[in-house]
């Protein structure tokens, strides 16, 4: 049987994603639009502890719990820790420059190390759009955090110049 001929080209069907409210979920908090799209939050850039703590407090669970543990681990591991919110994520540095960043996204937290390709062992995740040598991890729960390994990476990355810092 020959194929039916039509004068109109077929048009692809475009479906809008279903909108869900927090009430339809299992009692979970509604994620900010930026977390759903995979982009960093729209938190304003600001230096100091207070803006970072406010950024972390704005995250829904489990991202907030993960970010709080990473922040506490950084404070315990690195004397003279400096904090800042930049590009919608919390940034951490020691001395002259930023060493690593942490940001909440849908389903996980990104913990990315500047010059992470030089760390031993090299962290497993190569993020898109964060530089060729940036590496990190993307824990989905607090249980996914290997705190001993993360602390070791924090020490290693803090021992070399960070982004925006002077050469040592």
Model-derived features with residue positions:
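Charge-dense, helix-prone N-terminal extensions
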Residues: 1-168
């Amino acid at each position: 049987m020959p194929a039916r001929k039509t004068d109109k080209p077929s048009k692809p069907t475009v479906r809008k994603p279903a909108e869900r409210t927090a009430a339809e979920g299992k009692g979970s908090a509604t994620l900010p639009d930026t977390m759903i799209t995979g982009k960093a939050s729209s938190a304003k850039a600001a230096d100091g502890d207070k803006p970072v703590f406010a950024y972390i407090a704005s995250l829904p669970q489990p991202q907030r719990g993960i970010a709080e543990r990473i922040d506490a681990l950084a404070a315990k591991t690195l004397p003279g820790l400096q904090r800042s919110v930049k590009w919608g994520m919390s940034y951490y540095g020691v001395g002259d420059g930023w060493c690593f960043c942490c940001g909440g996204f849908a389903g996980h937290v990104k913990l990315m190390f500047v010059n992470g390709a030089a760390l031993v062992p090299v962290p497993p995740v190569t993020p898109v759009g964060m530089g060729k040598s940036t590496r990190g991890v993307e824990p989905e729960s607090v249980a996914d955090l290997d705190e001993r390994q993360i602390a070791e990476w924090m020490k290693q990355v803090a021992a070399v110049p960070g982004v925006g810092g002077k050469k040592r």
